[in-house]
Swiss-Prot record:
Gene3D superfamilies: Leucine Dehydrogenase, chain A, domain 1, NAD(P)-binding Rossmann-like Domain
Protein name from the UniProt record: Shikimate dehydrogenase (NADP(+))
Taxonomy, superkingdom: Bacteria
Oxidoreductase among keywords: yes
Positions contributing to NADP(+) binding: G132, A133, G134, G135, A136, N156, R157, T158, P159, E160, R161, L228, G251
Lineage: Bacteria, Bacillati, Bacillota, Clostridia, Moorellales
The species this protein was found in: Moorella thermoacetica (strain ATCC 39073 / JCM 9320)
Name of the gene this protein is made from: aroE
Enzyme class: oxidoreductase
Binding, shikimate: S21, L22, S23, T68, N93, D108, Y230
Length: 295
């Protein structure tokens, strides 16, 4: 258990809303296990209050912060510095306060790739379909492209946003994805041909658990299907894929590994991943036998 003292450092979660987040549970367990004199707190920050919240982090000497929806892209102009990877992605999910200089990083992409590695999927040369075009989609699209993914397809409810992301990838010298409107019939052949189908939208997240971004009959046996939503642990999207014989990965895995990378940025230490994984799965009512891929 963390003993809060006058010297205890603070780490924040900035988002709107944040009441559902498991990050405080995960990081406080990690700080305790690693002997770090830090405590992690969630703050519901409305978009109009973002600049003031960052000024508060700096004034109060916070060690750093995580950034979640809807601030991952909007926060960049308010930071003092941005890591080149995060700048290229155009989204920040982690902040480190370095001598009153707030520097933004993106651990979503590296956390996503590590979750694929732990599950046994190598994206090099593979075909991937990404559903969504927000901050998380940007991170995983850049991660897949830089990892040598053979082809990318983007699908979003507003295709203009997906087209902008495709342009950003092309502008960075990476292969430009094909773009669809989410749910268009023409997508079906792309989904069926894909090695990896990834949902980065909020469709299916509690309490709207009956929603799914794709009909399950678009999947084929042997595909990898990944949902960044982790509440519920098995979404309707993943349940449909599992019934079709797909190998599935829960969003809890990306939460775990992006969190582990953020822990290292704040502390300079290797994260206690086993502790973080156990706490997350206990919170979700799942077994703690490791990442949820294939289960």
């Amino acid at each position: 258990m963390i003993q809060v003292k006058a010297s205890t450092g603070l780490v924040a979660l900035l988002g709107h809303p944040v009441q559902h987040s498991l990050s405080p549970l995960m990081h406080n367990a990690a700080f305790a296990a690693g002997g770090q004199n830090l405590v992690y707190l969630a703050f519901d920050v409305k978009p109009g209050d973002l600049a003031a919240a960052l000024a508060g982090l700096k004034a109060l000497g916070f060690r750093g912060a995580n950034v979640t929806v809807p601030h991952k892209e909007a926060i960049i102009p308010y930071l003092d510095a941005v890591d080149p990877v995060a700048a290229r992605i155009g989204a920040v999910n982690t902040i480190v306060n370095e001598d009153r200089c707030l520097k933004g990083y993106n651990t979503d992409g590296s956390g996503f790739l590590r979750s694929l590695e732990e599950a046994g999927f190598d994206p090099a040369g593979k075909r991937a379909v990404i559903l969504g075009a927000g901050g998380a989609a940007r991170a995983v699209a850049f991660a897949l492209a830089t990892a040598g993914c053979g082809s990318l397809v983007l699908a979003n409810r507003t295709p203009e946003r997906a087209t902008e992301l495709a342009g950003a990838l092309a502008g960075a010298g990476l292969p430009a994805p094909v773009v669809y409107r989410l749910g268009d019939a023409g997508m079906r052949s792309e989904v069926e041909a894909a090695d990896l189908v990834l949902n980065t939208t909020s469709l299916g997240m509690w309490p709207r658990v009956e929603e799914t971004p794709l009909p399950p009959d678009w999947f084929r046996p042997g595909q990898w299907v990944y949902d960044l939503v982790y509440n519920p642990l098995e979404t309707k999207f993943l349940a449909g894929a599992r019934r079709r014989g797909c190998r599935v990965i829960s969003g809890l895995d990306m939460l775990l590994y992006q969190g582990a990378a953020a822990f290292t940025l704040w502390t300079g230490r290797e994260a206690p991943v086993a502790v973080m994984d156990r706490v997350l799965r206990e919170a979700m009512g799942a077994s703690s036998g490791g990442p949820a891929a294939g289960r």
